Amino acid sequence: DFDKKVIEKVVQHIIINSIKHDISINLSLESINNTAFIAWIKNKIIENKTIAAQLVFSATAYAVAKNVDKFKFFADEIHKCGAKIIIKRFETKFIPLGNLKDFNLDYIRLARDYTCDICKDHSKQSFIESISDLAGLLNIKVLPENVKDDEDMEFLKKYNLYAVSR
């Protein structure tokens, strides 16, 4: 019920304030795994189809890894309605890079461990290069989060990343 209330508030906020940008809505593992919730959310998106493309539903990589098949179903159903999907705190210990093609994702927000001190760590640099290349092929936008160091920020600008947050 909490996730439903948040979604209703976000939809109203977008409509009332004529918001034009996308808004991400965090969902619980329980909601993503609940077929009744998925039916409800599909109806809510369809009722508000003019803003569907602005709704980005978010799950953690950990939640996705807990039930991959349910998440795939959820992502496919959300996309059928015109909304978007992001996996946040993405880590390969939960979802291997090779498995990204199995999901229908719009965005990946990387765990901050991948970018902290990246300018000094060749394995992190290789990872960012790999995920950037793969995401480009899969049409997924990559967002490194919470980059603190100016050197790391400058280094990340070399890659074809959608955005970097500080």
Language model segments and positions:
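Single-residue recognition of alpha-helix boundary sites
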Residues: 37, 99-100, 122
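Ligand-binding cleft/hinge of the Venus flytrap
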Residues: 25, 131-135
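Catalytic core of bacterial c-di-GMP phosphodiesterases, primarily the EAL and HD-GYP domains
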Residues: 2-73, 146
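Active-site-adjacent beta->alpha loops and helix N-cap segments on the catalytic face
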Residues: 68-69, 119-129
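The catalytic core of metal-dependent phosphodiesterases that act on cyclic dinucleotides
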Residues: 44-118, 134, 138-166
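Membrane-targeting and insertion segments and their boundary/processing signals
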Residues: 15, 102-105, 126, 130
